From Swiss-Prot:
Pfam families reported for this sequence: Ribosomal_S14
Family per similarity comment: Belongs to the universal ribosomal protein uS14 family.
Keywords: Ribonucleoprotein, Ribosomal protein, RNA-binding, rRNA-binding
HAMAP family reported for this sequence: Ribosomal_uS14_1 (MF_00537)
Record InterPro entries: Ribosomal_uS14, Ribosomal_uS14_bac/plastid, Ribosomal_uS14_CS
Subunit composition and interactions: Part of the 30S ribosomal subunit. Contacts proteins S3 and S10.
Originating species: Ectopseudomonas mendocina (strain ymp)
Protein name per UniProt: Small ribosomal subunit protein uS14
GO annotation terms (biological process): translation
Length: 101
């Protein structure tokens, strides 16, 4: 089990990313636009750098919803491999069955 502080930190990062997503996309569009002036690009880069580090989506980490485990997490279910297996064996995941051949 991950520490509660790690889970809370990740939750705070998700909220920060959501808060700055629109403004960040606008600034990145200005930077990527070949028709924008060099001054506008420079101002956009400076404004982007002044945003919090955690506003970047690349700082997010997928964690298991139950345990908070950072590795071996299936995106489709939001569970780590261990908890997904347990849930599948109990029949909690509709349509997911153990393979047999």
């Amino acid at each position: 089990m991950a520490k509660t502080s790690m889970k809370n930190r990740e939750l705070k990062r998700q909220q920060t990313v959501a808060k700055y997503a629109k403004k960040r996309a606008e600034l990145k569009a200005i930077i990527a636009n070949p028709n924008s002036t060099p001054e506008a690009r420079w101002e956009a880069q400076v404004a982007l750098q002044k945003q919090p580090r955690d506003a970047s989506a690349s700082r997010l980490r997928n964690r298991c919803r139950i345990t908070g485990r950072p590795h071996g997490v299936y995106r489709k279910f939001g569970l780590s491999r261990n908890k997904l297996r347990e849930a599948a064996m109990r029949g909690d995941v509709p349509g997911l069955v153990k393979a047999s051949w």
